[in-house]
């Protein structure tokens, strides 16, 4: 068959295969056109997952008769001139969307420009244009697409169910709405209640309002503002506190010069920034906005324009990591704002009848006048068994028995319940602390600080502890011996299937070396060899901190509890343990009063 020029309709359908993959692609292209037209409100309607009908209405600048004539021709655009390909400032620029859509569907465009006496309408079916005719429209543009892919029936077989396609459309609109909080959006159709997002005020507060409307109240309550800037590149936005996580990275959004993009860059950068706060199987929710000179980023990577290429990707990644780490450190003592309130709201007073029971006869009830009954005695009259000598605990040297700690952020310790939780009284409520989670964070931060200064202090074991392990585990530990020694853990091979532990970190006190080594070996087996040394060392520190912390079930003396609270107040990131769980929750007196009907 000789080489020949393909007909224009066939060329457009081939191009449509890249630009119009599914109904969500159509919505994306049309909404981006509305944004580029300066719209302040965009209304979206879909039916049948976008297959049967898609309608986009905006109040933007509209098109003149001449512009409308060219708008459905390939590579005809008002957004680009001969020199601008490396300095793209609009969402669309290729001039392919409308002709591609018109080649595979029934397309109708009604538009009015301020310079025109009335609106104009144009219809395209399967690539064939109808004459432009006068129409009725006050201003802006209305685009309707029906019978998508009717001209290419084979494409219909690759679409998902209406529900799946509708959800893909909603996700596209959500991302565009997050990128432009200054524009009002509405979505209707698909037998769902209409969704409307009002235009938000300029600035960070308005952006957070829009993000909260889309990502939910939990995100709004736990959002941390972040920002970092260098060499003309600005990274800003909001990141959720470590206590708000998801099982996947779908809650991580990146916007570059107002364009929603999907980039593996953000996943790696966010994981690095949150490495001190979250377990490996949890992912935070973040929305980051990158602003830079348009000549420093290439948006012409793919026809769908969902990918970009940075001239200096390393700088962008470093700024993302710095912005997130700085924000997390600044809010390090913050707990999940919604946790305590949600729990309190679920409490209900119980009026169920009780069996006859004489509480005065209970052997645990102290009789008035006895030594155990002393309302004023408090902790001072109680005897509690403390830690074993040498066991790690909070530093009690700064504890002041006579001091009133209720004015401190974490208050004054009042009791310990279930030998696991410390209850402290603050000026306007109470705080409940998970003693293991809190101490784990303290030990971890001390290990990191020691590593950054003079190294971790070691304690030599008089008798080396021999730990029996399988040979693969022994090889793994010995191979990482230098990294372990950095943290004061010195191990040597001790014949087949065993290692000798000769030194341990002083900070851990008396620890179960066997359990620690098995845990470390398990984590090492999951490490990628490409994992940076710093990340590997942090994993080691986190594992050691977990093993070297106060365990649940240990009775604490009042001075130890108060010392732990004071250390938490002076330690960065003490609001979460190394696994992302909150170390404490705070209940305001007003919440407690509501629980008992006093408010």
Curated annotation (Swiss-Prot):
Family annotation (InterPro entries): DNA_mismatch_repair_CS, DNA_mismatch_repair_MutL, DNA_mismatch_S5_2-like, HATPase_C_sf, MutL/Mlh/PMS, MutL/Mlh/Pms-like, MutL_C, MutL_C_dimsub
Organism domain of life: Bacteria
Keyword field: DNA damage, DNA repair
GO molecular function, one term: mismatched DNA binding
Sequence similarity: Belongs to the DNA mismatch repair MutL/HexB family.
Gene Ontology, cellular component aspect: mismatch repair complex
Physiological role: This protein is involved in the repair of mismatches in DNA. It is required for dam-dependent methyl-directed DNA mismatch repair. May act as a 'molecular matchmaker', a protein that promotes the formation of a stable complex between two or more DNA-binding proteins in an ATP-dependent manner without itself being part of a final effector complex.
Entry annotated with the keyword DNA damage: yes
Keyword set includes Nucleus: no
Name of the protein this chain belongs to: DNA mismatch repair protein MutL
Name of encoding gene: mutL
An example Gene Ontology biological process: mismatch repair
């Amino acid at each position: 068959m000789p080489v020949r020029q393909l007909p224009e309709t066939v060329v457009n359908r081939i191009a449509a295969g890249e630009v119009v993959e599914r109904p969500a692609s159509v919505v994306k292209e049309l909404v981006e056109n509305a944004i580029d037209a300066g719209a302040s409100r965009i209304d979206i309607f879909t039916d049948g997952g976008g297959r049967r009908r898609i309608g986009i209405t905006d109040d933007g600048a509209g098109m003149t008769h001449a512009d409308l004539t060219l708008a459905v021709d390939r590579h005809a655009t008002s957004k680009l001139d001969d020199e601008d390909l490396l300095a793209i400032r609009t969402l669309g620029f290729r001039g392919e969307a409308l002709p591609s859509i018109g080649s595979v569907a029934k397309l109708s465009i009604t538009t009015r420009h301020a310079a025109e006496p009335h609106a104009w309408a144009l219809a395209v079916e399967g690539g064939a244009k109808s004459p432009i005719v006068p129409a009725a429209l006050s201003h802006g543009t209305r685009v309707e697409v029906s019978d998508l892919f009717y001209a290419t029936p084979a494409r219909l077989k690759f679409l998902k169910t209406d529900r799946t396609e509708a959800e893909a459309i909603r996700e596209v609109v959500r991302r565009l709405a997050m990128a432009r909080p200054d524009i009002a959006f509405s979505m209707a159709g698909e037998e769902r209640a209409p969704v409307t997002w009002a235009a938000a005020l300029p600035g960070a507060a308005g952006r957070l309002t829009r993000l909260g409307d889309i990502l939910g109240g939990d995100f709004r309550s736990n959002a941390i503002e972040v920002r970092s800037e260098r060499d003309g590149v600005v990274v800003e936005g909001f990141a959720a506190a470590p206590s708000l996580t998801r099982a996947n990275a779908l809650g991580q959004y990146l916007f570059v010069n107002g364009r929603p993009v999907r980039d593996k860059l953000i996943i790696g950068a966010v994981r690095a920034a949150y490495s001190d706060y979250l377990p490996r199987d949890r992912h935070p929710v973040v929305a980051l906005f990158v602003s830079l000179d348009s000549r420093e980023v290439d948006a012409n990577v793919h026809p769908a324009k969902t990918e970009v290429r940075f001239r200096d990707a390393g700088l962008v990644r470093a700024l993302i990591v710095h912005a997130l780490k700085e924000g997390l450190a600044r809010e390090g003592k913050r707990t999940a704002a919604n946790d305590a309130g949600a729990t309190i709201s679920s409490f209900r007073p119980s009026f169920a009848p009780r069996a006859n029971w004489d509480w005065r006869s209970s052997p645990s009830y102290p009789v008035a006048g006895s030594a155990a009954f002393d309302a004023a005695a408090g902790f001072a009259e109680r005897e509690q068994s403390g830690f074993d000598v040498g066991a790690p605990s909070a530093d009690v040297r700064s504890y002041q028995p006579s001091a009133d700690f209720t004015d401190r952020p974490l208050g004054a310790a009042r009791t310990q319940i279930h030998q696991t939780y410390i209850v402290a009284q603050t000026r306007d409520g109470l705080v409940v602390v998970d003693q293991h989670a809190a101490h784990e964070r303290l030990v971890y931060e001390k290990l990191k600080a020691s590593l950054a200064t003079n190294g971790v202090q070691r304690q030599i074991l008089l008798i080396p502890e021999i730990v029996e392990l399988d040979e693969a585990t022994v090889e793994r530990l010995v191979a990482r011996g230098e990294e372990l020694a950095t943290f004061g853990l010195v191990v040597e091979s001790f014949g087949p299937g065993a290692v000798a532990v000769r030194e341990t970190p002083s900070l851990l006190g008396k620890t179960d070396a066997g359990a620690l080594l098995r845990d470390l070996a398990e984590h090492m087996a999951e490490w990628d060899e490409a994992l940076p040394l710093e990340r590997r060392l942090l994993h080691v520190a986190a594992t050691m901190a977990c093993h070297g912390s106060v365990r649940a079930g240990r009775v604490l003396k009042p001075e130890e509890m108060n010392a732990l609270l004071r250390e938490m107040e002076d330690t960065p990131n003490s609001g979460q343990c190394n696994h992302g769980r909150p170390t404490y929750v705070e209940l305001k007196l007003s919440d407690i009063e509501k629980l008992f009907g006093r408010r």
